[in-house]
Amino acid sequence: GGKTVTVAKAMAVAQPQAALVHYAAEHKKMATIGTEQSLVIDPGSRTFDWLVTRGMRLVQKQSHSINRGMSDVLRLLAAEISKDVGSPYRDYDAIDLALRSGKSPVIFQKPYDMGRHLPLAESVAQQAVSTMRQWIETPESLQNIILVGGGAFLFKKAVKAAFPKHRIHEVKEPMFANVRGFQLAGQNYAASAIAPGRDRGAGEIA
């Protein structure tokens, strides 16, 4: 008894590329982003992704993804806490909240000082960013370095250290940068499909 929807055309957009669309819209760079070279860095839950673009075109040989996401950080810290308290500890949500808020999680009814484990968390970010840096051939040519994703807050320090002469751009609510970019790209694509005589490319921004 439901509705039937026919999809006439589909558009594939890489996840960090959608974040670039969102960044351009939020920072009012829609008119200029198409001529600029950008690096989009997306530390997510399970993977650490990065994308180099010229305009909106992907530079495949400089873009990649590795298994170094926030889940790796949380599991590593949980293992250290478990050894410290002498009991298995797997409250990943509590660890995540503590990292984001700076407030101590409560373990066995007592606030637990996470400070001693922060260098360990930062080392995961440093390893991921160091790997990415080896893929970037001409960092001096990057006009935009954009940090998005749920792990942006933890990886920011390592990213800044890797690109000390660049300004690192951020967006509001970086966790939702990709999904908002997907929506905007879809809306632009739909509008171009409706407009007579237009057939906008998948990566082009209106």
Feature map (PLM): residue ranges:
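Nucleotide/phosphate-binding catalytic cleft detector across ATP-hydrolyzing
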Residues: 1-38, 57-71, 84, 93-145, ...
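Short, glycine/acidic-enriched loop or turn micro-motifs at the edges of active sites
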Residues: 18, 45-46
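Conserved catalytic-loop position in the HRD/HxD motif
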Residues: 42
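Short beta-strand scaffold segments in enzyme catalytic cores
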Residues: 48-52
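Long, charge-rich alpha-helical interaction segments
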Residues: 75-83
